Amino acid sequence: MAIKTFEEYLKSLRKLKPTAYMFGERIENVVDNPRIRAGINATGATYELASNEKYKDLITTISPFTKEPINRFTLPPQSIEDLVARVKINRALGGYVGTCHQRCTGLDCLCTLSIVTYDIDKKYGTHYYDRFMDFLKHVQKNDLTGNASVTDVKGDRSLSPHEQPDKDMYLRVVGQTKEGIIVRGAKVHQTGSLSSHEIIVLPTRAMGKGDEDYALAFAIPSDTEGLIHVVGRNSMDTREIEGVDCGNIRYSKYCPTLIFDEVLVPWDRVFMFREVEFAAEMVSRFSAFHRQSHGGCKSGKIDAMTGAALLMMDYSGTAKVSHHKEKVIDMIHMAETLYGCSLAASYEGKKEPSGTYFIDPILANASKIHEGKEMAEAVRLMVDIAGGYVADLPSDRDFENPEIGELLKKYLKGATGVPVEKRIKMLRLIEKMAMESADTISDIHGGGSPAAHRLTIFRESDINYKKSCAKRLAGIE
């Protein structure tokens, strides 16, 4: 079956047996662990909406490769329409889950590999593109989720990969057999790795002579022997485990560190091996695609944040306060700016030799620069409207306590006629969207650091053209 339902997605994850740890203990049942399940549910929304009549036509399409219906999260864009659909899907999902749905990064890897493997083959006569296409068809036919395994631990940032005192600071090949390559290292910030069927590895930086062992791209199942998922902490990570004060009662985000401890990668899953000069292209293509994805996703999250702010105005009796309305207008403007930049990046896309369409990198990076600033400002405005109880609202357990619960509810009342429970729930949701570190930090660093976004814009811009405009107007030859 080419398109899975949500239940089929859960069933497919249950068949996997990943090695995973959290809070110092081994996780034996990933799917039913409440902390991980909230993240799995977020990815599961990409499957759920594929069968929802409202979103079905947007999220599903016919694969030009398998000729079967597929989820768009398995399709490298083959047209401008596909590029635009990526942004619209991500916005819809951002509002639907109110956090990261985690599936865009795997698609960004597929997009990248569909371009760069072709380019490598053209130069060296290798067969990476054919290998990748076999993998892509496997992903499409089974509606698999991929995790983008890109960011290395990096060690001493002033040194290149091969110069590191500890050679494992960047993922590298440490052996070869007739079956494949053996790799060792670690990748960090692995959003949704346990929600994924496949781990797709790309280089994290440009490389040069001496870095050949680090110039790798490949894909392996998420439960491959030697692959260890260590779930990271974030500021609200015990709420789901405790079963109270979750705020977002359905979805959340988690980000493991992924350790590759002598992992065997079959040759048919290797998509780049020691071609150092193509590491930079891998990074730049992935980064651009991912920054385009963010513009859709985060505009959708701001939609949910704006809704929360508006409801707090209703529940607190401030719906007619003019300066609150001004803040809401600012939030709407922020969402549309991110969305508009990502749509523009899509409409300005161009077809690559492999047939995949690539977005305009300047506009994609412009969207990400806005996101880094505007998401923080949107959070500030939402909290400004909501008030101080975002920081210190008593626990759900206090409200249910027979001795103090009714007293608390009495003093938490807001607008006349509004049940106090609505106000409490909305305050808790706002706390979640404002203060969950796994999400708020990615608004700044997701897809690369803010400095990287700015440098990319300068590097990709036609500086000489801009100078020529000014020279002509000033009469300078």
For every predicted segment, state its role.
Residues 293-351:
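Extended amphipathic alpha-helical segments enriched in small hydrophobics
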Residues 1-49:
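N-terminal-proximal low-complexity accessory segments that begin disordered
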Residues 325-329, 357-365:
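Short, charged, amphipathic alpha-helical segments
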Residues 37, 41, 137-140, 300-303, ...:
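Generic structural signal for well-ordered, non-transmembrane alpha-helical segments
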Residues 362-477:
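Alpha-helix capping/hinge segments and adjacent helical runs
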Residues 148, 153-297, 462-477:
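FAD-binding core of flavoproteins
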Residues 61-198, 204-218, 223, 228:
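Glycine-rich flavin
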Residues 28-92, 445-446, 453-457:
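N-terminal low-complexity or amphipathic/hydrophobic leaders
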